From Swiss-Prot, chain B:
Family: Belongs to the peptidase S1 family.
Enzyme class label: hydrolase
Protein name as annotated: Transmembrane protease serine 7
Organism of origin: Homo sapiens (Human)
Record-level GO BP terms: proteolysis
All ranges on the Extracellular side of the membrane: 98-843
Amino acid sequence: EMKKRVEDLHVGATVAPSSRRDFTFDLYRALASAAPSQSIFFSPVSISMSLAMLSLGAGSSTKMQILEGLGLNLQKSSEKELHRGFQQLLQELNQPRDGFQLSLGNALFTDLVVDLQDTFVSAMKTLYLADTFPTNFRDSAGAMKQINDYVAKQTKGKIVDLLKNLDSNAVVIMVNYIFFKAKWETSFNHKGTQEQDFYVTSETVVRVPMMSREDQYHYLLDRNLSCRVVGVPYQGNATALFILPSEGKMQQVENGLSEKTLRKWLKMFKKRQLELYLPKFSIEGSYQLEKVLPSLGISNVFTSHADLSGISNHSNIQVSEMVHKAVVEVDESGTRAAAATGTIFTFRSARLNSQRLVFNRPFLMFIVDNNILFLGKVNRP
Amino acid sequence: MDKENSDVSAAPADLKISNISVQVVSAQKKLPVRRPPLPGRRLPLPGRRPPQRPIGKAKPKKQSKKKVPFWNVQNKIILFTVFLFILAVIAWTLLWLYISKTESKDAFYFAGMFRITNIEFLPEYRQKESREFLSVSRTVQQVINLVYTTSAFSKFYEQSVVADVSSNNKGGLLVHFWIVFVMPRAKGHIFCEDCVAAILKDSIQTSIINRTSVGSLQGLAVDMDSVVLNAGLRSDYSSTIGSDKGCSQYFYAEHLSLHYPLEISAASGRLMCHFKLVAIVGYLIRLSIKSIQIEADNCVTDSLTIYDSLLPIRSSILYRICEPTRTLMSFVSTNNLMLVTFKSPHIRRLSGIRAYFEVIPEQKCENTVLVKDITGFEGKISSPYYPSYYPPKCKCTWKFQTSLSTLGIALKFYNYSITKKSMKGCEHGWWEINEHMYCGSYMDHQTIFRVPSPLVHIQLQCSSRLSDKPLLAEYGSYNISQPCPVGSFRCSSGLCVPQAQRCDGVNDCFDESDELFCVSPQPACNTSSFRQHGPLICDGFRDCENGRDEQNCTQSIPCNNRTFKCGNDICFRKQNAKCDGTVDCPDGSDEEGCTCSRSSSALHRIIGGTDTLEGGWPWQVSLHFVGSAYCGASVISREWLLSAAHCFHGNRLSDPTPWTAHLGMYVQGNAKFVSPVRRIVVHEYYNSQTFDYDIALLQLSIAWPETLKQLIQPICIPPTGQRVRSGEKCWVTGWGRRHEADNKGSLVLQQAEVELIDQTLCVSTYGIITSRMLCAGIMSGKRDACKGDSGGPLSCRRKSDGKWILTGIVSWGHGSGRPNFPGVYTRVSNFVPWIHKYVPSLL
């Protein structure tokens, strides 16, 4: 059943056609090299969406940079399709589902002096369900409160304090947030969760609540990249992939990440009985994308060279900040009880070796449905 | 030493050197690279062909100048050292060459097939020398070359060979081919079977728009769904491609209702035959096997394999036969072709097959039946191609309608049962009956399944990987409000038995449900209806207050099939007299030849267990899979062990070769006797979903020696249908985990005393208990078997003679040692005839 689901995944294919550039993984590497020993967590689909939205208001080379940066080389007609694709995806993602909490949104906060083009505002609203807010950036504390309150409200309090500080010279701030919590298809047993050591490095050890469940998982050992990958399905279409690099091989795995690698993993998954040990954690990533995206070729929009004529007639406006925040909680809860009667009766043969998979050192994590919802590295749960 | 001597000693050495250096021409090329010639060392060898140039140049001058003083001791030592050195270099080079040569020869063979949709079949394709065949195979080879030479495995890709091009029932061409990869053995591990197949599948460009499975593979129109590619054997490659065809044959079956014989046998030598059968398009092939003569060893050496293709592609196997058989069995293909391979590489006695095949039309498995309003069974439904084994991926639909809304539909199966589908998949048939899901499983008795609705829609989908046993069911209507006649009891198996037979100690329902929830089984003890026979009579347990059921048990009466017959033809009522520890026959023949252990050692002593004393359980065996302890087993004879079927469930586990049996062991790893396993016999009705029939026999490759009989002893098999009394104390032993949460098994053999639990309590605890299972433990938990103990013995000591009886086999449970969840064991007394079928020497 899961195999079928895995086969049906077209990672990154539904919206963004396969690209020359690998936006998702280049962005990952850019974030990783900026903060090598820290956890990383972001939502590629959400960032792509917010950039595509921005491109609606961009012109000339600013727009080209965004589209090319996303790995798209589009004709006018297919640009329309791109936006429509995102519109559809947003509608799908925002649909309420059992045991599935996802809040994803974009908002643009512009200074009072900026007059917005009506066409842009309505396109944002209809295609991206995004709001624009006039903001008095000269009162930076007030502006920050306005932005943070908005996001907190939208995420039902799951993301508070999006901004920690705000530059009073800001004119346009783009905000992109995503919160995700879903139930596993089969829950982990609370009783099986125990404090265990997690080796942040070989010297640094922290205690983490470690969940455990023995089950049939989709599993593979990638010998090329030296890592083990296990797929744990959520209720519905999403699946979490946890990637455990062999000791000392994190860098190698990070360098090998690509859409092709991900496809290969999904294809090579085999069902296997495993004793899985996974930390219970909540991970978040908060990024000032204006500092990272220029290394991926998207730079103009954040400088005075920005052509944002589609957003406003006001000359010389630029996106001062582009804030992305992604939050995911991982715990035991699942739709189906792990210990439902009738399923927990087990044969008493011994286990074969190498059937324990313990995520007790830094690992990578994907959450995919039809797109890569999240990508991250957990250095310290 | 004088000159002559030294000359003599030098000459043969020189010969050797030149001999070798001439033989290994290529070695010299490598020599300078690996070991540069020794610079500046003077080599005073007279007049020889030098193995290396710099050495040779220096020689002649020295020799002529200083002839006599030259052969001093020092020079001789130098000479000898150099000689040794050269010899070592050459030997090393040879070794290196040998290793690199054998390494590079490590080839990987893949057998596969796919369907090309845009080329029509021509009769010429049957001729491998024809222009047409050569042309189409060249095209396919070029395409495969292109696929793999541009893939990640291009470095290792050697070639592809088209083996067969055939017609098929879906149209177009079915191409069978081999792909060969060559790589150093050290790199073999990076080679995964799935990757090779994925490369081919990835190369097929399917169009999403027209939504067919046909895509373009480098210009060929290939059906994506038809692509199969598996790792194959070198021997299969050479016998299907090579010139040595041996006993291999092609058959083209063009005539319906004709039996094409397939017979081959040999009394010595080897048989490795591939029979390729091709029928006319639109038809299928049925292979009927009359008898097979092979060595039984789980197909390790001898096998008969039936493929749903023309090449030995593993995932298209329809069936495998690993044991000799004389019962007629038949198998049906899903296409117009079939491959039958017969392998017997070392014929010791007689090996051979007697079979025939025929061309049959495809059958639709569907039917709509109007059932008459009389209640009873009136017709039959069966699996496709009954009585043949039915091929995988089949689908049947049946619709039934009764004439009255008060009548439902009843299905009576002969050796099959359908039960609600759990979260796990179905192994032997997936049933959808009026929108409810069920799984089917085979068993050794009848069952009746009732659908309380006048309109019944049934769909059966085959879920087995291989062909499955033929299935037959009788259908009829029944009264929904009263499924069983008045005065009868409805068994869990669905059968109806007279109420009077409930709780009489006789398993009338076959599933024992008529003997559960009884106050205590009561045979009719009063004179009028006293039954002279039955399990409660003369079973050693006093069931009647007046003791009547245990009277006159060994009094001679006329023989019939319910009496026990002594050696001197005297018969009496006590049926389980054989080896029960009491001499009943006047001539003592009932206790003759009972070889099992009369507990050598006095009772010494898992979860809540204690260390045993060494030698306390001489029948206990530890089964190691690829070197690590995986299950337990019990010694029942010199070469046979009894264990649990689930220990051998799965591709790798079912192969006997990775297994070793450790006998006479106390501390893990210190066995007195270790033998590889020659053969594993898993019960044919074993079902991993229902835990039923969890029993397996193992034959050792080497019988344990008589000299170890102090340390290794067989345990007794219980008499057929032996009754156990709840509360009886027995022992479970093993090297399994000592706590549920442990990760490893115990080092020292553990033992725990457990009580046999009343079957009714066992059924009410677990629900899914069958008559093949029994519960043992203590209700407070704490003492139980656990992971790693499976297959091991539940040993009970018989009071009458002090012998140890193998009452149960560790099978399953809810966790381990949890309160109110006793361990579940396979009830050995239900399998005595089955054990005797394979181990006749036990009686």
